[in-house]
């Protein structure tokens, strides 16, 4: 795999164009022609208008969809910030490959392919999992940077390549997921710095920490930030010092979606932080970021607000793996079914509605 340099990454970011407002207007006009109250489908109408602005066309094909589940281990787990150890990352990755996990069952119902990806699982590569690994896990960020700046760039580059490859294979909709013990800790650390928020505000219980465990997690993040002194105006510095290979790879996936013109669905808090990194690197990349749900992690809503994105679902989800993103896909299908096949005012012999305000 050819390594990406920072200069090459910056060149790609410069190629990301603003949304196509002509295509957005065409999608809006089509919605307005259908025999229903104007804006009656609310966020579902906005969804396809935003997709038109991204893809450059008011005609869509989301029949092929995939969820990419990026798996990676985090050295900060050594600080006791999780109920489980790194062996669980590998175990879940193996079960993703065997199509036995929660997201696999949900994806089957949503007619969505599942692509488990190894961005940096501790130990040897996992059979049946796409090998995009940067290293066998990150370092403990309480003792120094989690990864080098070059590794952060490379992880982003591999995420970009992943989305672009899926687009080339004909996928019209890409959902994001992740698996990595300790990644709510890394996500909270990155978000606290980028959003200039207190660590305690940005930190939750993850997979179910006790009060003592939560206090240890908050203290660990504070020590990591103090140790590394990341520059909040330099996303690559923050990602490299406090992030994980999964977050960096997901960041790249959103950037890849902006380059390829493919909607990329956020899952919960972790992929939301990755999307925030992508948009901080390139504001125009926001056109490829589509929210699915609002996680119960305390900082999830703050991240969504920073991105200016509204979730389609609020269902108390906090499982990970991309389950929330996949859960939103049927709403895309229903929106498109109405958009494509609902009769128009003209076809129904009905006088069109006109805006009254």
Where are these regions (language model features)?
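N-terminal loops that bind phosphate or other acidic moieties
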Residues: 2-357
